[in-house]
Each structure stands twice: as structure tokens, then as C-alpha cells.
UniProtKB/Swiss-Prot annotation:
Molecular function per GO: carbonate dehydratase activity; zinc ion binding
The organism's place on the tree of life at top rank: Bacteria
Similarity comment: Belongs to the beta-class carbonic anhydrase family.
InterPro entries, sorted: Carbonic_anhydrase, Carbonic_anhydrase_sf
The name this protein goes by in its record: Putative carbonic anhydrase-like protein YbcF
Taxon lineage: Bacteria, Bacillati, Bacillota, Bacilli, Bacillales
Length: 175
């Protein structure tokens, strides 16, 4: 993975310490050309949410031409699992589950537990696809997904395969 040394590269990463040096080496990006947005799970939940807004600003204000959405291999948000198990949350979660399943487009479908504990590979693939097909992201911007795997003591990087959905917005928004 060779990145043009003079171009800014945006990394949307999980909240994990120590990823930047690994990513600099893997992508051949210098520290001064590296921009980072961190969120739990490196997830973009909505095509017009705050994280996507930050990505778009970075593209236009910092001349970003390449974006990497980076997750930790097969990591699940354990905090989310703890939230759904709290007794004080059960009624709220039941109400939210109803909304998730019956009040689209405001909610994503599924359950609160699925939303909080989504698999990292699915999250990365969806986020890459959402950025790639967003109407405000120029077609020249390359968007790739990466996983950092810490097994065996030495981190390794794997590229996420392309997902070909072709749309960043739900079907009901396109009609």
C-alpha cells in the first residue's frame, strides 16, 4: 500500500491506542499527512451524521484523496453487551427494540443489542460503502477498509474486500 507522500490521508479508526504508528508503516503515510477520526468501532451509523460530516469536511478542507476505515479484527463492543444486560435498561431497550423494528427510516432495523454489538467486519464494510457512495464524496477519493489483527504479538493488517451495494441511502430515500 503506497500512498502519495504529499497527499493527506484520513483514517477513521476504532478507539484503540497505538494504531497510528502501525497504520503509518502499513500505508507508507507520514505523520504530518495523517488525519485521524476516532469512534467506537470505526462506525458511520448515518450518511448525514456527525462522523460523515467530519469526513466530508476533511475531504474538502484538507484535500484528502484517500480514506482508510480501520477496525480491530473481529472485535465486538463489549460495553454494548453490558448495557443491554442492566436491569434498569430492560424497559428502555424493549421500547427501543419496538422502534428499531417498526419505525423506519428513523431507526436502522434489528434490535438495540444488534446495533450496540455489531460485528467489526460488517461495520467496516458498511462504513466503507457509505463513504464510497455518498453524494458529497468526490469519485476520485479512494476509500478502503483495513483490519488490524494483534494475534501473535505482532500486528498485521488485512484489507477489507469491496462490497458492491452502490448506494449510501436506504431505498425509501431514493424513490
Amino acid at each position: 500500500m503506497n500512498v502519495n507522500q504529499n497527499k493527506k490521508v484520513l483514517f477513521l479508526t476504532d478507539i484503540e491506542n497505538g494504531l497510528e504508528p502501525i497504520l503509518q508503516e502499513a500505508t507508507n503515510t507520514s505523520a504530518e499527512n495523517m488525519l485521524t477520526i476516532q469512534s467506537y468501532g470505526a462506525s458511520i451509523s448515518h450518511p448525514y451524521g456527525e462522523i460523515m460530516r467530519s469526513v466530508i469536511f476533511a475531504i474538502y478542507q484538507e484535500d484528502v484523496e484517500e480514506i482508510f476505515v480501520v477496525g480491530t479484527k473481529d472485535k465486538k463492543t463489549s460495553a454494548g453487551n453490558g448495557l443491554t444486560q442492566l436491569e434498569t435498561m430492560k424497559d428502555k431497550i424493549q421500547t427501543l427494540d419496538y422502534l428499531f423494528q417498526n419505525c423506519k427510516p428513523e431507526f436502522l432495523g434489528g434490535t438495540v443489542d444488534e446495533w450496540l454489538n455489531e460485528n467489526s467486519s460488517d461495520t467496516i464494510e458498511k462504513s466503507v460503502d457509505m463513504i464510497r457512495h455518498h453524494p458529497l464524496v468526490p469519485s476520485y477519493v479512494k476509500v478502503r477498509g483495513l483490519f488490524v489483527n494483534h494475534k501473535g504479538g505482532k500486528p498485521s493488517i488485512a484489507e477489507v474486500p469491496d462490497v458492491k451495494t452502490g448506494q449510501a441511502m436506504p431505498d425509501h430515500c431514493l424513490s
